């Protein structure tokens, strides 16, 4: 138990220590200031901008920024879709893997361009090396960079005033890749290789075991994809077992690096925001609220798993476990990680829009599974995905400012900018589109016979598997309750739709809000006379409960039919 506390403390301290330097670095990159990696990144950026031509030089309005973002995503979607359909005739395919069916290729392409990485396939049997490297791994970089671009555009809109432009998407995209994601990923990949993660394009090995049977050992360019999988909060594993596989996550060191990587950029953006708007206290307040939400989620999930079998009263089981006083739930977990390493990793991955797992979420106790759902359902705002976590949290921040200001009889304002009705329309659109998407698609799936046939469990847990799939898709997480066999035409198409709506619907609202904020006057006098201090402890509490009430209550009735009912059924066994 003491070792668990030490690990947790070390993890939190590590995240806190890297937040300021990495946040400052991101600030310098996007403000065109000198950085230590200019010598490495600038040559790539020059070639990239030369190819783009004039489109990368002019500042863009919010509408132009969004149009460029969508245009790029459409091109990326077509690129990935074609490769997945034709991978059977493309090179670097020693296992002679055939092309995917159209519904599955559609789902996978949408999944990777939206930074969701939902996988209705098994990576080692359904995707060639060529497709892994040129389609999926590339999208791990660019989809994360797209989310980062949106966050940076939003931050600019708060810092700037009385102008119409929020930056240039193409320029921001290159900076995100060449200065941030690519250099850090290279370092992480090298560490992974030294830790035993394979990096090759060899054919799978056929070995004879001592029992006289043949075993196939997969190979592949795993280290390079694993690095960006975590750093870019993508989560899509090279193998079906994801980070529970010893090739993806062989040691406690790689496990720790993956967890830190998942939170690194999201945490750093809180400081980037504070530095950019000239109020670092504001950034640390966001960091603090995120951290408290994370700790609460981790504690509930861990306690639920440590005492996950206490409802069993069999004398034989009590005789075996009587010495420890409680029954921990080790089903679906790697014995080399144990309960706490598993719950810590999965709390991190479901809090961020990562979706990687080092244990089987479907085998968790109902309450622990519910916490994973809540982490996603509130909008992935507990640090969240690269960029997406920050702009999702900012929507709740705006709502808290609006509610708090009205409660004290003041005109709503944030950092000297007046918050008006149009701003709140975009804010609420961003906050409600994903929950609406989840509830509609879950309700439809619950009455579709083909979905029932895809379930391995019935009743409350079966409903939880359906609910989890659409929460994960709409909030761009990508993890799953594996009891749902997701490779059906209906699920491939509807989950793809939920991913598209959850990603680009929210991004559209965020960029439109940015376009509104950037045009406003910034009055320091307005900020000073307002009695709503947005860096105070009271305001932090207001933001905390706004997230819980607005984010949590929208999905609570569905949770009541799923994991809560599932837990009650266990308690009354």
Swiss-Prot record:
Protein name per its UniProtKB record: Potassium-transporting ATPase potassium-binding subunit
Main subcellular location of this protein, as a coarse class: membrane
Cellular component GO terms, alphabetical: plasma membrane
NCBIfam families given in the database record: kdpA
Localization: Cell inner membrane
Similarity field: Belongs to the KdpA family.
The protein's role, per its UniProt record: Part of the high-affinity ATP-driven potassium transport (or Kdp) system, which catalyzes the hydrolysis of ATP coupled with the electrogenic transport of potassium into the cytoplasm. This subunit binds the periplasmic potassium ions and delivers the ions to the membrane domain of KdpB through an intramembrane tunnel.
């Amino acid at each position: 138990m003491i070792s668990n506390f030490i690990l947790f403390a070390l993890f939190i301290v590590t995240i806190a220590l890297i937040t300021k330097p990495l946040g400052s670095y991101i600030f310098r990159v996007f403000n065109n200031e000198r950085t230590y990696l200019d010598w490495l990144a600038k040559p790539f950026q020059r070639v990239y901008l030369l190819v783009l031509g004039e489109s990368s030089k002019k500042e863009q309005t919010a509408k132009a920024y969004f149009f460029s973002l969508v245009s790029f995503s459409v091109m990326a979607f077509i690129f990935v879709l074609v490769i997945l359909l034709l991978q059977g005739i493309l090179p670097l395919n020693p296992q002679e893997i055939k092309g995917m069916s159209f519904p599955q290729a559609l789902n996978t392409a949408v999944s990777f361009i939206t930074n969701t990485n939902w996988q209705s396939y098994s990576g080692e049997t359904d995707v060639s090396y060529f497709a892994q490297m040129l389609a999926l791994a590339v999208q791990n970089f660019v989809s994360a960079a797209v989310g980062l671009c949106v966050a940076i555009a939003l931050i600019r809109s708060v810092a700037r005033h009385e102008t119409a432009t929020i930056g240039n998407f193409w320029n921001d995209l290159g900076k995100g890749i060449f200065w941030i994601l690519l250099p850090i990923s290279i370092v992480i990949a090298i560490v992974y290789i030294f830790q035993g993660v394979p990096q090759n394009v060899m054919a799978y090995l056929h070995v004879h075991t001592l029992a006289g049977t043949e075993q196939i050992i997969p190979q592949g360019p795993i280290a390079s994809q694993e690095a960006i999988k975590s750093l870019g909060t993508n989560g899509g594993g090279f193998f079906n077992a994801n980070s529970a596989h010893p090739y993806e996550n062989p040691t406690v060191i790689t496990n720790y690096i993956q967890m830190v990587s998942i939170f690194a950029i999201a945490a750093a953006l809180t400081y980037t925001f504070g530095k950019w708007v000239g109020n670092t206290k504001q950034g640390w307040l966001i960091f603090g609220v995120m951290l408290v939400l994370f700790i609460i989620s981790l504690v509930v999930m861990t306690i639920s798993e440590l005492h996950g079998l206490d409802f069993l009263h069999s004398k034989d089981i009590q005789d075996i476990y009587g010495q420890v006083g409680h029954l921990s739930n080790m089903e679906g977990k790697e014995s080399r990680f144990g309960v706490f390493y598993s719950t810590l990793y999965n709390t991190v991955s479901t809090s961020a829009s990562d979706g990687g797992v080092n244990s089987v979420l479907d085998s968790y106790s109902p309450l622990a599974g519910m916490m994973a759902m809540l982490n996603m359902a509130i909008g992935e705002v507990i640090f969240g995905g690269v960029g997406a976590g920050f702009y999702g949290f900012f929507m709740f921040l705006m709502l808290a400012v609006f509610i708090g200001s009205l409660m004290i009889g003041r005109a709503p304002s944030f950092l000297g900018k007046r918050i008006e009705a149009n701003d709140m329309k975009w804010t609420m659109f961003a906050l409600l589109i994903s929950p609406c998407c989840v509830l509609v698609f879950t309700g439809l799936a619950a009455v579709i016979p083909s979905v029932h046939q895809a379930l391995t469990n019935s009743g409350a847990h079966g409903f939880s598997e359906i609910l989890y799939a659409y929460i994960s898709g709409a909030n761009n997480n990508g993890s799953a309750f594996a009891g749902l066999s997701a490779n059906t035409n209906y699920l491939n198409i509807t989950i793809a739709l939920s991913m598209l709506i959850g990603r680009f619907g929210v991004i559209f609202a965020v960029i439109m809000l940015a376009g509104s904020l950037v045009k406003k006057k910034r009055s320091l006098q307005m900020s000073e006379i307002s009695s709503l201090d947005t860096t105070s402890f009271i305001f932090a509490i207001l933001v905390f409960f706004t997230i819980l009430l607005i984010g949590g209550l929208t999905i609570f009735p569905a949770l009541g039919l799923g994991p809560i009912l599932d837990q009650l059924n266990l308690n009354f066994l």
